[in-house]
Each structure stands twice: as structure tokens, then as C-alpha cells.
């Protein structure tokens, strides 16, 4: 267990991080980069991150002190007022900085939302001449989350009061413009919460602050245009997000703070949602079934028999929204679910990443020979996969208590599990803590000690009807006991399948080897090897009846099934720009469509291009390069742009010579068409050459990234991650078979190790041949990467965290402590993010490379957290439970449908442990044999054609007892195929034309028939009829094979008629747009 060694671990991280910084500082100081300083500052805590992000010096100390006694929300409001008071001489700056610093605190100082989510803060005037505050939001505000979005408006309100600025008074016409925009935005992007027009009116009429936004969408409003105080006709996405998903959706949370601070104008939020009780709303349990994509199967309908059975607990690789299933289930589902795959779920949240747990129940299947069996191993599943008639039960899905707590979902009734049953054991029965009773012992124990029936012998009685129970009782009365089995008539096979009882079918008879609990539950017993009826008592329902017949308490075995479908498949792969790029070197059109620097050089091109200008420190020459082309000395930034003529061939040869590389040995070397940074700053070409030499590509910020799905792990076995005991101990762990993982250690895929090995060689080559320093990594194999540091960074954030590689898995995802994921503001519901080698980030990242467009700062390491603080990470990780065994009171609470927060203290969540001054020494309730045991690559990623994908998806629906195959077919057509066909069909007649040589686009073909930019005559359509008809055959096939609703069949037939008549498909003619025009 981790205890005092955590201090040593943190000190080791500090030491090795500072070593990398020293190397990077020495390299950067040579003047061979666009900046002479390392551009990723270390922030030791949230206070420093906020200071670095917002560039307000001197507030870190106060943030740090007040955070000890205030909640994050209270702290943000207090510091915002403080900042405003310091800057009150400039009211606009005071407002701007106050709102941004408040939002930065709310988002732990690692999101880009405070910088880019707020485009501007202004003071404007109402029609009566009074002043008001306007906040202009943009798209990146989404990453802040609804509560932080709403509180940013509240912060502006509080600050404008401090500065004596009046309230916003909207006109009726402006309010109607907002309503039109919200409806249009929801149609384009889909809001998490779509408010009613009255709710929008209510908030806007009473909001003292104008919630504005920049025009983020191409689409414009059709009415309420050219308004004086709304400066764009385009739809304002940022405004829609803050208004709908912020203030209105999070109204209850906002009220908590407005009431405390006596902001009475906001009391109107109490009326949000009050009039919705009579409205027809979609059944929440079916939300996960929306927008089904072709090729991604549905595994179970809401609470339908045969689906995943809810089981409470946390494996060592679940929690933080991740759930575990038996690896055999992955195989039985035709490998569609792999380790790390996302599934959309009915409860407790919206989605979960899937991990393996072989200590929970696996699936049951009916074979073509009529046998009903439990599939107990992947090998067995592989053997029978072509002999499966029906999948009758998917087994259990393990969901942690902490996920119910996080989603504030009342606890659903737990099945009667072994861990619950053990609480009934006394000292006499302690032997059964280590082994299961057989069928006879189970019944006798229950009778003698008045205990519920042992789990597994309780069956799914709630899944059959009273009529079916009576048929089963009659069949048992005529059953025959033979040696160690019972023979029943095959007429009751469907009833036994529903009950989850195994049997073999032989000569129209069913042979049961496990039968004694069944006959006892139905009012029979064995006397002299004969089945004898001993009870005939009846109740109103099946479960009550079997309790009465048996005289034994039989609890529900599967009271809750969890509906699910495949979401995103797991992901692991190096980050590539599109197309792949080796360096941020602009080529315009000189490199051709492949952006080849080598081809541009061979053509002898002299490029005339505007770039960021630099001045030689020695001779004063102006150049875009970091080295002077005349004297070879370093240059410095002049903070200006200028047109330069660049001899690409000479630039390439000079760069290759400086890094001792023969260009002839490099197969491809790709640049970019143009630079997106503010001043078109060019990256040293030497770096692109070395990346190409080592087969790696670049991200927009100059770093080499590897993307992976996020998967939690709290404990690992050294032999499952390619470690030896000796290496394990060198990393600071004990020599135990199972170790609790340190908070910033990560286990990466083998493929990631292979990629990072090449990156390490690139870095060493760079250090030696470009900077003239010694190598650092010196890795000869993937195993040499163990112990090296990385930066973990999530999309939509601007703060990285140091991580350490400790091993490899065969899984397409990154196993790491829940705290590590939460430090990046991620959970494990299918999220993915990236890592880069620490020294790569320090040497090669530059803010000057980042795009100047909105969102350009996202996914960039603007600050780096060295040691994570559990108090400053995403709070979801604090809800992870840590018990080895859930207490009896937990199961009693599920019987009462209790709120999860009511039992939080007994469940020992991370939050409870931290209050006690520790967060290590935790446990888990279910073991997993091997974290790589299970399907490792989702079938969705290996199936090629759409025809095969839809065939596999619907083929699985056909054999799943928990799925309605006809409904799945209808949903696939309605949510995927038909919108695609309709959209492309409409776009065909309004499309642009494109030059294949320079990519210029035209609304109409130029009269000359040639491109006006490059003169090429090869101008083509951007939408071909093939994109319209590509799903037609699959649509027809599905319509003919499945029973679809009449309205859908009519809709499809009408669409087919339109398309076939337009393109004359029946006669085999390929009608072009020219032909259509001529026919007119």
C-alpha cells in the first residue's frame, strides 16, 4: 500500500521534471528557436495556474489562503470582486479581468474558456441612456460546463454593482431574436437542454447583464436582422450555450448563490421548469437510443430481460464513469465491445468506458442444438460463436456506487449477490466465505438458518408470468430424476431460458444437472429419489408464490437491467494533422496537393510569402528563419510581418546539413499550405527533417502527440504491465503481486510505446545535432521508456499534468489513476486525450505556432501542473468509492431507493478519505485477472464496408433477447441513412465547384472554364451523385427484411422515387448536373 512513499514519489517527479527543464532552458537559450525561453511554465497549484493563465500577478497568495475556507464558487465570486476593486479606475478592464479570473477559478485554471470562451466584455448604453454590461461569449465557453457558464454571468452582475453600472433592458424585438437563434442553434448543434420560449423570455427580461455572443455559425437568422445592439446576423453559439445550458439548465445551482448574496433579480429562476409537468417529454430511460449510427449495435433496451444486469461494486479498473463487464460477454457480442470502448447507457449517467472483470457473471446463450448454457471462457465463446441461436442473457455490468453519487441518481434495487448473502453467514457457515455451496447445501442452509436462497439458485422469477409458472409446475410434477440430473419435457424450454437455468436438449427432453433449488422453489421436494409435491400455496405474483411454495426467502436476482448501445469505439493512435505534417513550414501551392517540401525544392521554386520577420543579432539581416542565412547567427523576433522570397531548395539543403542528415534517405517530408498563427511564425526546418527521419508527425503546436481513450485503474499486477519485480521496486513500489498505483503513473498501449520510442530518438537527435548537447533518453527499446515523464493534456484545456510511464498493456487506452484523469478535467465515460514526452513539449512547443482563430489556444500546454492536488482536481474523482466490501446498510439502502448522498460517509469515498487527511491505501471490491484480458479491438473498427457494418449490427440485434430488431432497423434508417441521403440530395443542387489543382472553390464555374487562381481547366463538382445513392441499396434491403412502421416505409419510397427519377438510376444512366440543366 502507498503511504509515506508518496512523499518520495512526489520528490522524484519534481527532480526529474526540473532536470528536463534545465536541459530545455539550456537548449532554448542558444537562440535556435522562435523563443529563447521554455514556454510551458510550471504551476504548483490552482492559484498559480490562474495567475499564469489570466496574467494577473499577486493574487495567487489570496486564492491559496481563501480556498482553505471557501468553496470554489464562493472563492471565484470573492476574488472577482477583489480584482474589480483593484482595477476600478478602468471599468472595462475591471469587468473583463474579474469575469475571466472568476471563470478561471471555477475551472481550476486549466481550461481555455476564460481566455477564448469570453470574446469581449463591454459597457454599452440602453435606449434611455443608462449603462449596462455585455459579455460576448464564443464557442470555447462550452468546455467550462453549465454551472461555470452561468456563474460567469453572476460574476459580471456582482462586479457591475460594485462599479455602479446599470442593468440591461432588452426590447421585445431583441428577446424574440434570442428565441429564434436558440431554436436554430438547437437544430444545428443540439443543446443539452432546450428551454421553452417563455423560459427564455423570463430570463432575458430579468437578467441585469446582456448575454451576447460572436457569430459562430455560417447560418444567419431569417427574422430580427440588422439589430442595433446585436452586431451580427449569424447565430451566436456562445450565447445559446450560456443562456440554455448555463443559466436555465443550472437554475437550481445558481439560486443557491443568488439567495446567499441577496441578488433578488435572479429569484425568477425559481420559475424555471415549473410549467413542464404536463408537457410530453421523452422517456429519459430511452435517451441513449437516440441517434443510433449504422454499424454500432444496440445491446439492450431499457430494463429489458436478457440485457446487462446491474451489479454494484468497483473493480480495480472501474469507477469515474467506467463500468466493467465479463470479458466473455465482449466475445459473445461479436467483439463489438472492446476494452476502452464507450457504451451509451440507460443509467446512472449517459455513457461509460468498458473494462474487463472476470469475477462477475458472464453471458448465457441458446445453441442451435437447443442447449442453454453459461459461457465461461473466451475460448469456449470462440468455439461456439457460429452455433449461437440466441443470446439470452448478457451477464452483469459492474457499476460503482460512486457513479450513482456523481449523477445524483437514487440507488436502484440491488440484486441479491454473494457479497450480500455473506452478511447472513454465522461462524458455523464461515466455510462458505471461500467456496460456494452446492445446490443441495444451498437449500438446506436456507431452510435451517432462515437465510435467503443462495445467489445463482434464485433465478429470474420476476421474468415469467403466473401462467408460465403453472406450466413449469406441471412439467416438474412429471419430471424424472435420473442419477444426478432431472429430465423435463421440452415444452418448458422457453420458461427455463427466461429463468436463466442451464439445460441440455436430447430427444425432445431437457436435461438439468442443477435442479434441486428449482423443484423446491416450485413446491416440490425429493423423497426416495422421487419428485413429491409438498406445497401448493399461491400469491398474487410469481416471486411471492415461489417464496410461499418453497418456504425460503427468494430475493429478486435481476431487479434492474441496464439498457446500452455502442458509442465510440476505443482509440489509441498518434495524432496527425490532416494531411500528415512533419513541420510547420508553409509551402502555399509549391508543394502540390501532397505538401511535399522535397518536391517543392526539386522544382527550384522561389516562394514569395508573407511571414513573421526576425532580425539577425549579429549582422542585422531581416529573415523569417531563426538562423541568419548570411552569417548563421541566431535571430530575434521583430514582432512584424514582411514579404520574403524563399529559395526552398537552398533552405532545405542548409537545414539538412546543419543536422547531419542526407535528404536522399528521407522518403517524405511534408509541410503545411499556410500558417494559421497570428504572425505566421515559421518553425525551424531542421526539426521537420528530423521528425521525417524518425517517422513521426507534428501537431499544430509543435509537439508530437499520442491520443488514447481514458481508462481508470487503482491497482495493478506487475506481470500484466511488462514489469519485472526488480524494475517495479526501482520505480518506488513494493514487491507485492498487486500494488496501488501512484496518482501520476500511467500504463500505455504497446503501440504508444513504439511511437514514443521514435519520438525519444527524434529528441536525442535534436539535442545532439541541432542544439549540440548530449542525448537524454538513449532508449533502445520500448522497455527503456519505463520511468520517463510525459505531459498529459485533454482537448478543450490549456493545462497539462506531469505523468510517468510505468508499463504497457495490450489495450487501446491509457490506464491511469482516477486523479490523473480528473486533473485533466476528464472522466472515463469514453473521453480521450493525449500524452507527449515531457522534453518534446519543453523543447518544441511554442504559443507562436498556435492558430489565431477562436479555439486556437485549446489543447495546448499553456501551464503545467507538476504535482496534483486532490483538492484541486475535477470533483467527480472524489466520488470514487474505496471499499473492499460494500456494507450491509448499502444493500438495505437500495431496497429503499435511497439517495446516494445519504450513505456517503459509510461508503468511504475519496472525498471522505481526503477529509481524514489521506487519499492512498484504498481498496476495490472486485478483482480482475488481467487488465488486458478481453477483446482489444472493437469489430466496428475492423469491418470495412457499410453494407457489412449494417449486416453485423442487425444480425446481432436478431439474436439478442434484449433487443427489438425491427425497432433498431427503423432507428438506424431514421437517424443515420435517411438524414444523410436527404442532406446530400438537397446539397447536390446548391453545391460549389472546386479546382483540383489549387482547391479554389466557386459558386458557379467561371465562364472561361478555367480556374481564376491557377488557370487549371480541371474544375469538378464537390458533391457527386454517388454520395447520394451510397446508402440506397442498404436502405432498400433493410426495408424489405424488417418490419418497419408504415410511415417510414412511405417516406423511404417517396425518397427513392425522387432520387431515381432525378438520376435515372433505373435506366442505368449517370445523370450529371450539366445534363439536368440542359433538360430544363
From Swiss-Prot:
A biological process term (GO) from this entry: DNA-templated DNA replication
Organism of origin: Picrophilus torridus (strain ATCC 700027 / DSM 9790 / JCM 10055 / NBRC 100828 / KAW 2/3)
Lineage: Archaea, Methanobacteriati, Thermoplasmatota, Thermoplasmata, Thermoplasmatales
InterPro entries: PolC_DP2, PolC_DP2_cat_dom, PolC_DP2_central_dom, PolC_DP2_N
An example Gene Ontology molecular-function term: DNA binding
Signal peptide: none
UniProt keyword Transferase present: yes
UniProt keyword annotations, A-Z: DNA replication, DNA-binding, DNA-directed DNA polymerase, Exonuclease, Hydrolase, Multifunctional enzyme, Nuclease, Nucleotidyltransferase, Transferase
Subunit: Heterodimer of a large subunit and a small subunit.
Assigned EC number: 2.7.7.7, 3.1.11.1
Keyword Transferase: yes
Catalytic activity: DNA(n) + a 2'-deoxyribonucleoside 5'-triphosphate = DNA(n+1) + diphosphate; Exonucleolytic cleavage in the 3'- to 5'-direction to yield nucleoside 5'-phosphates
Family that this chain belongs to: Belongs to the archaeal DNA polymerase II family.
Protein name (database record): DNA polymerase II large subunit
Superkingdom in the source lineage: Archaea
Pfam families referenced in this protein's UniProt entry, alphabetically: PolC_DP2_cat, PolC_DP2_central, PolC_DP2_N
Role according to the record: Possesses two activities: a DNA synthesis (polymerase) and an exonucleolytic activity that degrades single-stranded DNA in the 3'- to 5'-direction. Has a template-primer preference which is characteristic of a replicative DNA polymerase.
Amino acid at each position: 500500500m502507498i503511504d509515506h512513499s508518496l512523499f518520495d514519489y512526489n520528490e522524484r517527479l519534481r527532480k526529474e521534471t526540473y532536470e528536463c527543464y534545465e536541459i530545455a532552458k539550456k537548449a532554448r537559450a542558444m537562440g535556435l528557436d522562435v523563443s529563447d525561453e521554455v514556454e510551458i511554465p510550471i504551476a504548483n497549484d490552482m492559484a498559480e495556474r490562474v495567475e499564469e493563465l489570466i496574467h494577473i500577478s499577486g493574487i495567487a497568495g489570496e486564492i491559496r489562503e481563501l480556498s482553505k475556507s471557501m468553496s470554489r464558487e464562493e472563492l471565484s465570486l470573492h476574488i472577482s470582486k477583489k480584482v474589480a476593486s483593484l482595477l476600478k479606475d478602468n471599468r472595462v478592464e475591471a469587468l473583463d479581468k474579474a469575469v475571466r479570473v472568476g471563470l478561471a477559478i471555477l475551472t481550476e485554471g486549466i481550461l481555455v474558456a476564460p481566455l477564448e470562451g469570453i470574446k469581449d466584455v463591454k459597457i454599452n448604453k440602453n435606449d434611455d441612456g443608462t449603462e449596462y454590461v455585455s459579455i460576448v461569449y464564443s464557442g470555447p465557453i462550452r468546455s467550462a460546463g453549465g454551472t461555470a457558464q452561468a456563474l460567469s454571468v453572476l460574476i459580471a452582475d456582482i462586479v457591475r454593482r460594485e462599479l455602479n453600472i446599470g442593468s440591461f433592458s432588452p426590447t421585445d424585438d431583441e428577446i424574440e431574436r434570442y428565441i429564434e437563434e436558440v431554436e436554430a442553434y438547437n437544430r444545428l448543434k443540439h443543446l443539452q437542454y432546450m428551454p421553452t420560449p417563455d423560459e427564455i423570455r423570463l430570463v432575458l427580461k430579468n437578467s441585469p447583464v446582456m448575454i451576447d455572443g460572436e457569430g459562430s455559425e455560417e447560418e444567419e437568422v431569417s427574422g430580427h436582422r440588422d439589430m442595433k445592439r446585436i452586431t451580427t446576423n449569424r447565430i451566436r453559439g456562445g450565447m445559446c450555450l450560456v443562456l440554455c445550458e448555463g443559466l436555465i439548465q443550472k437554475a437550481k445551482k445558481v439560486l443557491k448563490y443568488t439567495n446567499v448574496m441577496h441578488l433578488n433579480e435572479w429569484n425568477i429562476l425559481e420559475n424555471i421548469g415549473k410549467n413542464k409537468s404536463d408537457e410530453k417529454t421523452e422517456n429519459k430511460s430511452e435517451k441513449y437510443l437516440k441517434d443510433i449510427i449504422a454499424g454500432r449495435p444496440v445491446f439492450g433496451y431499457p430494463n429489458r430481460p436478457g440485457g446487462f444486469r446491474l451489479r454494484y461494486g468497483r473493480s480495480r479498473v472501474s469507477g469515474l464513469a467506467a463500468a466493467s463487464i465479463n470479458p466473455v460477454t465482449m466475445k459473445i457480442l461479436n467483439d463489438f465491445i472492446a476494452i476502452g470502448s464507450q457504451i451509451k447507457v440507460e443509467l446512472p449517467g449517459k455513457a461509460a468506458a468498458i473494462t474487463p472483470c472476470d469475477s462477475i457473471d458472464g453471458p448465457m446463450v441458446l445453441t442451435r442444438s437447443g442447449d442453454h448454457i453459461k459461457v465461461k471462457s473466451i475460448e469456449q465463446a470462440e468455439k461456439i460463436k457460429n452455433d449461437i441461436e440466441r443470446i439470452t442473457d448478457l451477464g452483469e455490468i459492474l457499476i460503482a456506487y460512486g457513479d450513482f453519487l456523481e449523477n445524483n441518481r437514487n440507488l436502484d434495487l440491488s440484486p441479491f449477490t454473494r457479497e450480500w448473502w455473506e452478511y447472513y453467514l454465522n461462524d458455523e457457515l464461515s466455510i462458505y466465505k471461500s467456496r460456494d455451496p452446492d445446490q443441495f447445501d444451498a437449500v438446506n442452509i436456507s431452510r435451517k438458518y432462515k437465510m435467503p436462497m443462495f445467489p445463482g439458485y434464485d433465478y429470474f422469477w420476476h421474468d415469467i408470468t403466473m401462467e408460465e409458472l403453472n406450466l413449469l409446475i406441471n412439467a416438474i410434477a412429471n419430471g424424472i430424476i435420473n442419477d444426478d440430473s432431472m429430465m423435463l419435457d421440452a415444452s418448458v424450454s422457453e420458461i427455463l431460458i427466461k429463468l436463466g437455468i442451464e439445460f441440455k436438449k436430447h430427444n425432445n427432453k431437457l436435461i438439468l444437472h442443477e435442479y434441486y433449488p428449482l423443484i423446491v422453489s416450485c413446491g416440490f421436494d425429493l423423497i426416495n429419489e422421487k419428485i413429491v409435491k409438498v406445497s401448493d400455496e399461491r400469491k398474487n405474483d410469481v416471486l411471492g408464490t415461489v417464496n410461499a411454495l418453497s418456504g425460503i426467502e427468494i430475493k429478486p436476482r435481476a431487479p434492474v437491467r441496464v439498457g446500452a448501445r455502442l458509442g465510440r469505439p476505443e482509440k489509441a493512435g498518434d495524432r496527425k494533422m490532416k494531411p500528415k505534417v512533419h513541420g510547420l513550414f508553409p509551402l502555399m501551392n509549391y508543394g502540390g496537393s501532397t505538401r511535399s517540401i522535397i518536391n517543392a525544392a526539386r522544382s527550384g521554386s522561389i516562394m514569395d510569402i508573407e511571414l513573421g520577420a526576425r532580425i539577425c543579432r549579429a549582422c542585422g539581416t531581416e529573415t523569417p528563419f531563426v538562423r541568419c542565412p548570411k552569417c548563421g547567427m541566431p535571430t530575434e523576433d521583430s514582432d512584424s510581418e514582411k514579404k520574403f522570397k524563399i529559395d526552398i531548395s537552398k533552405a532545405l539543403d542548409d537545414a539538412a546539413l546543419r543536422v547531419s542528415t542526407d535528404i536522399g534517405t528521407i522518403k517524405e517530408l511534408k509541410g503545411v499550405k499556410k500558417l494559421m498563427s497570428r504572425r505566421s511564425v515559421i518553425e525551424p526546418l531542421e526539426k521537420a527533417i528530423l521528425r521525417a527521419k524518425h517517422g513521426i508527425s507534428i501537431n499544430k503546436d509543435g509537439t508530437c502527440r499520442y491520443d488514447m481513450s481514458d481508462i481508470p485503474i487503482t491497482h495493478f499486477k506487475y506481470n500484466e504491465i511488462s514489469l519485472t519485480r526488480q524494475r517495479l521496486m526501482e520505480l518506488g513500489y513494493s514487491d507485492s503481486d498487486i500494488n496501488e498505483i501512484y496518482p501520476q503513473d500511467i500504463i500505455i498501449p504497446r503501440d504508444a510505446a513504439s511511437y514514443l520510442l521514435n519520438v525519444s530518438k527524434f529528441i536525442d537527435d535534436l539535442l545532439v545535432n541541432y542544439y549540440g548537447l548530449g542525448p537524454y533518453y538513449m532508449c533502445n527499446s520500448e522497455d527503456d521508456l519505463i520511468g520517463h515523464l510525459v505531459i498529459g493534456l485533454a482537448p478543450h484545456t490549456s493545462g497539462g499534468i506531469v505523468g510517468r510511464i510505468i508499463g504497457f498493456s495490450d489495450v487501446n487506452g491509457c490506464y491511469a489513476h482516477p486523479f490523473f484523469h480528473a486533473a485533466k478535467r476528464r472522466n472515463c465515460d469514453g473521453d480521450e486525450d493525449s500524452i507527449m514526452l515531457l522534453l518534446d513539449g519543453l523543447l518544441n512547443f511554442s504559443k507562436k505556432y498556435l492558430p489565431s482563430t477562436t479555439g486556437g489556444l485549446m489543447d495546448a500546454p499553456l501551464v503545467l501542473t507538476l504535482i496534483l492536488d486532490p483538492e484541486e482536481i475535477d470533483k467527480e474523482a472524489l466520488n470514487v468509492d474505496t471499499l473492499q466490501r460494500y456494507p450491509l446498510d448499502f444493500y438495505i439502502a437500495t431496497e429503499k431507493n435511497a439517495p446516494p448522498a445519504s450513505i456517503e460517509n459509510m461508503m468511504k469515498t475519496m472525498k471522505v478519505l481526503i477529509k481524514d487527511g489521506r487519499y492512498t491505501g484504498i481498496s476495490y471490491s472486485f478483482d480482475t485477472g488481467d487488465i488486458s484480458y478481453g477483446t482489444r479491438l472493437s469489430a466496428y473498427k475492423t469491418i470495412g464496408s457499410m453494407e457489412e457494418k449494417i449486416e453485423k449490427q442487425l444480425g446481432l440485434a436478431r439474436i439478442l433477447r434484449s433487443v427489438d430488431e425491427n425497432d433498431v432497423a427503423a432507428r438506424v434508417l431514421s437517424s443515420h441513412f435517411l438524414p444523410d441521403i436527404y442532406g446530400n440530395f438537397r446539397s447536390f443542387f446548391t453545391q460549389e465547384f472546386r479546382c483540383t489543382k489549387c482547391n479554389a472553390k466557386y459558386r458557379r464555374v467561371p465562364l472561361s472554364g478555367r480556374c481564376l487562381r491557377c488557370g487549371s481547366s480541371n474544375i469538378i463538382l464537390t458533391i457527386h451523385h454517388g454520395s447520394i445513392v451510397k446508402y440506397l441499396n442498404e436502405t432498400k434491403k433493410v426495408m424489405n427484411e424488417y418490419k418497419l412502421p408504415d410511415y417510414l416505409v412511405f417516406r423511404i419510397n417517396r425518397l427513392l422515387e425522387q432520387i431515381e427519377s432525378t438520376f435515372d438510376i433505373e435506366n442505368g444512366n449517370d445523370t450529371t448536373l450539366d445534363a439536368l440543366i440542359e433538360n430544363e
